[in-house]
């Protein structure tokens, strides 16, 4: 992997982690296009950590409130949502990893993501804020986040859609989705790091510059993606993303049918 490839992958990771178009699906797609196979796991760890930084900056007030009052309503809702995510992720880890490697279901999953966004956009605007959100709501969104481990199913798309279906207002749905992603991203990074160590991998002879470039590219693009997504949710424009992932999904299916993917 060279620095240019790392820059593209980092920018795409940061944007697609928070825009509802599936970061994992785009990374699998680009890695196939670039023909990348070596040190992909370590790169994935770093770019995911890079996308975490914007959340820590943008939602610093909420995070500080959680630290000061760890048994308040918000942290308990996040815990309730994180448990099903962890159970699904750990329970089906090997299955999900096989799908990542093959990329055989990317087209179908992009189309499913578009359908979910399209249906969510047609939900009536909810009125639930933090105080009115129940633990059942949080668990529902957490299950959605767990299912989004599939390669081209958008995590932000599925969790925001799940929150809207449960009646959360748009601004709170986006905020809860982003806050719920923090333990998920951290947990995934820890598991990937464990796998990296178990593979007896080391950094000897590895050019670290592409990894540094990827980290900062993901961090910067992720920041703008979160800000943009919060604005989009206020305006109710999720269907824009539906059309994009539908076109992408159909294109992949056509290429697969032609034996060119």
Swiss-Prot record:
Top-level division of the source organism's lineage: Bacteria
Topology with respect to the bilayer: Multi-pass membrane protein
Keyword Membrane attached: yes
Substrates-to-products reaction catalysed: di-trans,octa-cis-undecaprenyl diphosphate + H2O = di-trans,octa-cis-undecaprenyl phosphate + phosphate + H(+)
General function of this protein: Catalyzes the dephosphorylation of undecaprenyl diphosphate (UPP). Confers resistance to bacitracin.
One Pfam family recorded for the sequence: BacA
Xref: HAMAP family: Undec_diphosphatase
Keyword Transmembrane on entry: yes
More about this protein: Bacitracin is thought to be involved in the inhibition of peptidoglycan synthesis by sequestering undecaprenyl diphosphate, thereby reducing the pool of lipid carrier available.
Family to which the UniProt record says this protein belongs: Belongs to the UppP family.
Entry protein name: Undecaprenyl-diphosphatase
Localization (cell): Cell membrane
EC number: 3.6.1.27
Transmembrane segments: 39-59, 76-96, 99-119, 173-193, 206-226, 238-258
Enzyme class: hydrolase
Lineage: Bacteria, Bacillati, Bacillota, Clostridia, Thermoanaerobacterales
GO biological process, one term: peptidoglycan biosynthetic process
Entry GO CC: plasma membrane
A GO term for molecular function: undecaprenyl-diphosphatase activity
Keywords for this protein: Antibiotic resistance, Cell membrane, Cell shape, Cell wall biogenesis/degradation, Hydrolase, Membrane, Peptidoglycan synthesis, Transmembrane, Transmembrane helix
InterPro entries listed in its UniProt record: UppP
